[in-house]
Amino acid sequence: MERKSTSPAAQVLAPAVSEIRSLLEASRKNVAQQVNQELLLTYWKIGEVIVRYEQNDSIRAAYGEKTLSQLSRALTKELGKGFSRSNVYNMRQFYLSYPIFQTVSGKLSWSHYCELLSISDKEKRSFYEKEAVNSGWSVREMKRQVESSLFERLLLSRGDANKEQVLALAEKGVDYNKPEDIIKDPYVFEFLGLPEERPFLESDLEAALVRQIEDFLLELGRGFMFVGTQQRVTVNNSHYYVDMVFYNKILHAYVLIELKTTKLTPEAAGQINMYLNYYAAEVNDPEDNPPIGIILCTDKDSVAAEYALGGLSNQIFASRYVLYMPNKEQLIGQVEEVLKRWHSHEDE
């Protein structure tokens, strides 16, 4: 006998549930838009303050080209996250590119504008801004359209019919914005002073590796301090997360660790070097030494540990860092210990 999917009581309540859902969705959308509008206005005002103070002769004489870097450090120390050098630079550019705030669309997020600010041509930037508003493009979709040279293709097309065809093709794969997309934007978490939602580790095995490596380095007694897991790195308006970050107080250097449950690949090496460049430019204090990276890879056949030095020379690493860092054999031993426990549980 076939069961009915809904009870009579549920059917009676369905209109009320639908109306309440509509009210809640509308309210969430309004809240998201209000937060976004306030964020944009605040960052625009901060940009105006930066430009105004840059014109101060004493500040220009004291810091010169390093003004933004010094300001970024001062703001981060005083106010917390949200004031990386790149974000402070974008606030400045936001004000310079949109000197009249009323021309800024509240329908686009700060992440949208960070992407738009990378477009130097004013007409081209205006085109993508309007299309993003009219078509409801997400940041990811807008980036895809920019990379596909939609603006240039439209310029080359002849006649309105061809332009409509190009636009229609461009709309394929559109990922429209939702209120929760705005609220979950890392920039919004920073603006509101809320703890950021971090991605979960890919597997229980990676979580076990994190615990093992953290305990090992802290017990090593060579100046390691644990900063955290899944630490965000924002490069070209794209967000990435470093698996583990330590700071060595003896070396005055950050140590970034990436865990991979696959063989070591060139892509993994390139990714951690990108993280190292970010930390050197955005996180390091003037007295800090260059950061270093460690990649730990494990698959069915082997375990590997590799150091990533970024811009650091092998000679400096050998003379200054090696004494305080674990060697590859020690790191591999820690991974193998976790794998041994892991496989013994699987066999039970």
Annotate each predicted stretch with a short phrase:
Residues 1-348:
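Basic, low-complexity intrinsically disordered segments
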